[in-house]
A protein has these predicted regions:
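N-terminal start-of-chain detector that recognizes signal peptides
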Residues: 29-32, 39-42, 83-84, 139-145
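Structured beta-strand-rich core segments of catalytic domains in phosphoester-bond hydrolases
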Residues: 2-65, 71-73
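Flexible glycine/proline-enriched surface loops and loop-helix/loop-strand junctions
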Residues: 53, 74-79, 151-154
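Metal-dependent phosphoesterases centered on the DNase I-like endonuclease/exonuclease/phosphatase
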Residues: 86-172
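Extracytoplasmic/secreted cell-surface and envelope-processing proteins
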Residues: 18-21, 77-80, 119-124
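Short flexible/disordered coil segments
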Residues: 40-50, 70-77, 127-133, 167-172
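Second-shell loop/turn segments in exported
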Residues: 1, 11-12, 43-45, 77-87, ...
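Metal-dependent phosphoester/phosphodiester hydrolase catalytic core
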Residues: 62-92, 96
Length: 172
């Protein structure tokens, strides 16, 4: 049944040592790809460290131009204190790309999504990516994270040590 739908994929190989990449699966009947690019996340303190690229796909959905960024931030391996700065680097890359889009296209429709390995209330998401959980708190440079309200209700996408995390997010 999937083959009949003619789904397509946008994908780039990333430098991740485990071979994990991100991609965007789409139906060309509804979404037309105009351009795509991959952005590396580098660690200035460790030139040998590698993680997944972040994917930017610009296209048309129902005749409207949209930008979709797909990310899979570094894991929490080694604990939050050790691994948090790596996710902050990933968030900074995402935010930099978003800022570039907004500078060129102030009314851009942007979707930032993926497995962030952090919750909606973590600093990497709130501070580095500059997201807020309530529409009324939106300011010119902020993104809206609808997943924050789910998280605050105890809804998650990952159970770990008898608690829910909401790492899989869609931010607009």
């Amino acid at each position: 049944k999937l083959k009949a739908r003619n789904y397509q994929i946008v994908h780039y190989e990333s430098p991740d040592k485990r071979g994990i990449d991100v991609g965007l699966l789409y139906n060309p009947k509804y979404f037309k790809v105009l351009s795509s690019s991959a952005y590396e996340v580098n660690n200035p303190e460790d030139s040998t460290w590698r993680t997944r690229n972040q994917l930017l796909v610009t296209g048309e959905l129902n005749g409207e131009r949209i930008h979709v960024m797909v990310a899979h931030w570094p894991s929490r391996r080694g604990g939050q204190k050790k691994s948090g700065p790596k996710r902050a680097l990933a968030a900074d890359v995402g935010r930099s790309v978003i800022d570039s889009i907004i500078k060129a296209e102030p009314m851009a429709k942007i979707f930032y999504l993926g497995d962030l390995n952090d919750d909606p209330i973590d600093d990497s998401v709130r501070e580095n990516l500059k997201s807020v959980g309530k529409v009324e708190k939106l300011e010119e440079d902020k993104l809206f994270n609808p997943m924050e309200s789910f998280y605050k209700k105890g809804i998650g996408t990952l159970g770990y040590r008898d608690a829910w995390n909401l790492f899989d997010q869609i931010i607009v």
